[in-house]
């Protein structure tokens, strides 16, 4: 079990080192830098920042994140995870959330029931992304914890498994740049009881075609991010 205070650094899932000082049943659609090790530079990676509004226990969230990381590792994408605050007043306590990086970053908001209902999604929706049109590049998603718990109870499944798969599903929408779904795998629209059992056992995955598309998207975002960063020469002017 990880003991380090995750507010102070990035938990790495094969991605790199921290260097520094210190939509239906279903799913809807301080100065430090993080870098990939040279030996894995050809493998795309992302940083996922979690905002735990629902107050999921730390060890439960850790295991769910590791499940999401495993699913993306199977798809050829490394992940690093950062715990971020839920209020601006707490931001100074989470220096890892402010770290600059040349790696694409995404935010996942884990919401309690009263916050989830404000998004006006169907009662069977377990998650939601900020995509408003096909092909859009979004960067954040929300997960509805109470609805996931209801499915865990209904299917006698694993909370960490289903929560981890729900996060992977929503990140999948973002990286595939679509609110659409597939007929098989983790991007199915309506999850059956058997799908929830597979999720609990860690057997819902992205298809090879989806994995290819997501790796390309991560690389394109990383290149665009680097190109948009001001150079040392421009900063000196």
Feature locations, PLM:
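Bacterial N-terminal signal peptides
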Residues: 16-30
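Phosphate- and other anionic-substrate recognition elements at nucleic-acid/protein interfaces
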Residues: 2, 31-34
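N-terminal secretory signal peptides that target proteins for export/translocation
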Residues: 1-15
